Amino acid sequence: MFSRLHARLERLWHIPFFYALALALIAAATPLAFAPYYHFWLMPLLFGALIRLAELKPKHMVLSAYLFWLVAYSSQFWWIHTAMHDVSGLDNVFAVPLTFLMPAVLALYPALAFALWRRFGGSRTLRVGVVLPMLWTLAEFAREQLVPGFGFGWGALGYSQIAEYSPLAGFAPIAGIHAVTWATAALAAWLVLLVDTEGWKERAKAACIVALIVGAGCFLRTQEFTQNTGRPVSVAAVQGNIEQQLKFDESRYLPTYQLYYDLVKQTHAQIVVLPETAFPQFLQNIEPEILTQFAQAAERNGSELAVGVPAFTEDGRNYLNAVVTLPNTQKQPAQQMYAKNHLVPFGEYKPLPVITKPLYQLMNMPLADFQRGGANQAPLNMAGEKVAFNICYEDGFGDDLIAPAKQSTLLANSSNMAWFADSNAMWQQLQQSQARALEMGRYMIRATNRGATAIVSPQGNIVSIAPSDVAGVLESTV
């Protein structure tokens, strides 16, 4: 019965319409494997389906892979349209094509992996079970590092496995998210060989390797690769819930400061983190009295405060997207700063200013020409802890966080996800923070403007999370 059904499906997939429809539907289902749905088990099945469909049409394998991931990335990253059209007001005449532009570029990397895979000889077991997972992992690494102008690791297979009950997440602490990506691709490949291989010996071998991959992940999940040091410390992540359209309105500056001041006064946590650009003015332009009031409020409560704020460079010619600590007279006499290193192209710097200047005017985007901070910046000293900060989507670059994390005892992300409204972007970024916490074996404090503000454990699990679109303070002990 199974063989007859399999044969009928094989004939059906040879009809171009049904083949293309199957590719599109499977690709469109990939967002379900990621946050906020966390159906991690889906991704090996979906990727395995792509492998089998690609094998059915070897002459069109590269095109099939490209179209699959064009649909997949467009589905996963539809929040690009949310940011440009719904929040920034860009007309759909421009917003829709631009939404598909990045997926169209990103899909070139999977297509290249399948193009190389097609050229490999040898047995099917070798090509599917060994070569393809290796090529896929290299393509994902290249996509993170070598996208023209910037890297972009969102949507990597490995992130789909950063979930509480996923066994494959166990590979993250030993070799990072790329190891999880390899394990996911390998599991998918060997599942294909298990289901679609003749001979019981070959199927038994495939079953053993599937069990080995899953079993190794389960074992690694039980291991502790870091140890707690020192005493527990209380932390707080502040969520202001400031609408993006009002954030840089000068008439809203004082109400914004008052809101954050009231929230800071509520907490007695030792470490308090505010979101990216929580203070909307340049640091040097803020009235000194305002900064003093925040520092004094934190000091009265036994807190040390880190705030997201734009700041001019020392020469005053450029500006930074920064997190600064507000000094107090007892514990933190000097101001410390972390400046964002990975800037968002077209959002925080202008790769092609002659072409993109009209676009910025249409989208009414403030602060779109930041200067990069340096690489491997030192952690900030707060309440006896060394806190390695990253800003916005920087927590998607795990390789860049290794050096700062080695010097740190805590990780912290300060973000403003109001650009993406209620889309899945905030949840996908939270999943990346979970990956970084798991890789580095450290707690992650996430302070965002509207969500998802959360505390993540060294095991990559969400300890506590604040409701989205509500102003408040999320407290925990780490």
Functional labels for PLM-detected ranges:
Residues 2-222, 422, 433, 448-459, ...:
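Membrane-embedded alpha-helical bundles of multi-pass enzymes
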Residues 96-101, 242-248, 362-363:
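Short glycine/proline- and acidic residue-enriched helix-loop micro-motifs
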Residues 255-258, 276-478:
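Solvent-exposed soluble domains appended to multi-pass membrane proteins
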